[in-house]
């Protein structure tokens, strides 16, 4: 696990995403209070956290379990003079330490898969105030019957990945009102995630060329990039924007 974080060190994001998609999803929250209380779950180094601070005048709680990501975000928060509005906290998404009905908005980009889509939606729902929103991105099959190579890769990497229709059924079963959904563009995978990761992999391949264990991990990360380049029309990240009564 430590080497995984060495591979991902200093990446702009810890998963596919981009500021325009964050803004597009945020603009769907038509009844959000003027100064919302926001929880950013699995914030990573916090690119979307800072976007949320720009998009709202609210108070943001950004949580993650990897301290170097939190330290990176805390430094950015202080540099931008946002320390009175953004609290950076070491907490697990599986054990969030907040009272019920604490938040107007729960946000999570490229992270809910850690719990599972349905498990995350059910676990976080009590933290929302009445009429509160939740917006998450989730890896989703774009069409049925994917080729064996991509299916086998994601059966190992994320076996519970579902289709759009299945995820919409989960949202309904969890008693959320669906506001909107949209698929992230391919550039959200490449520009801020895979391109900088590829540069990092290339550097680490030279550094650890005689270390079989680390080379194996680098091969897995490289395979993920190669699979996307070959099969990106079969899967993608969807933004799902929901609200409770």
Predicted regions mapped to residue ranges:
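Conserved alpha-helix/loop element of class I SAM-dependent methyltransferases that forms part
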Residues: 16-34
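Short, glycine-/aromatic-enriched active-site segment of Class I SAM-dependent methyltransferases
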Residues: 139-158
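Class I SAM-dependent methyltransferase SAM/SAH-binding core
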Residues: 39, 47-95
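A short SAM/SAH-binding and catalytic strip from SAM-dependent methyltransferases
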Residues: 105-118
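A short glycine-rich, Lys/Arg-flanked "PGG" loop and its adjoining helix->strand segment in the class I
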Residues: 119-133
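Conserved Class I S-adenosyl-L-methionine
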Residues: 182-245
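A short acidic, Gly/Pro-enriched loop at the edge of an enzyme's catalytic core
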Residues: 94-105
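Short alpha-helix
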Residues: 160-175
């Amino acid at each position: 696990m430590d080497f995984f974080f060495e591979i991902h060190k200093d990446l702009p994001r810890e998963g596919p995403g981009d500021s325009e998609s964050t803004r597009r999803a945020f603009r769907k929250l038509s009844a959000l209070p003027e100064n919302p209380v926001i929880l950013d779950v699995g914030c990573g180094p916090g690119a979307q956290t800072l976007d949320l601070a720009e998009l709202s005048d609210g108070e943001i709680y950004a949580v993650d379990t990897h301290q170097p990501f939190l330290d990176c975000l805390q430094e950015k928060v202080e540099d931008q003079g946002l320390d009175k509005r953004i609290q950076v906290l070491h907490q697990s998404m599986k054990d969030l330490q907040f009272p019920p009905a604490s938040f107007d908005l729960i946000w999570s980009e490229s992270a809910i898969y850690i719990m599972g889509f349905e498990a995350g939606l059910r676990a976080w729902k009590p933290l929302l105030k009445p009429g509160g929103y939740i917006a998450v991105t989730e890896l989703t099959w774009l069409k049925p019957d994917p080729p064996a190579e991509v299916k086998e890769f994601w059966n190992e990497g994320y076996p519970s990945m579902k289709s759009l229709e299945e995820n919409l059924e989960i949202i309904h079963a969890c008693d959320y009102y669906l506001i909107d959904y949209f698929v992230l563009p391919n550039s959200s995978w490449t520009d801020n995630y895979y391109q900088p990761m590829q540069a990092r992999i290339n550097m680490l391949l030279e550094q650890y060329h005689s270390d079989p264990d680390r080379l194996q991990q680098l091969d897995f990360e490289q395979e993920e990039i190669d699979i996307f380049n070959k099969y990106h029309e079969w899967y993608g990240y969807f933004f799902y924007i929901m609200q409770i009564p």
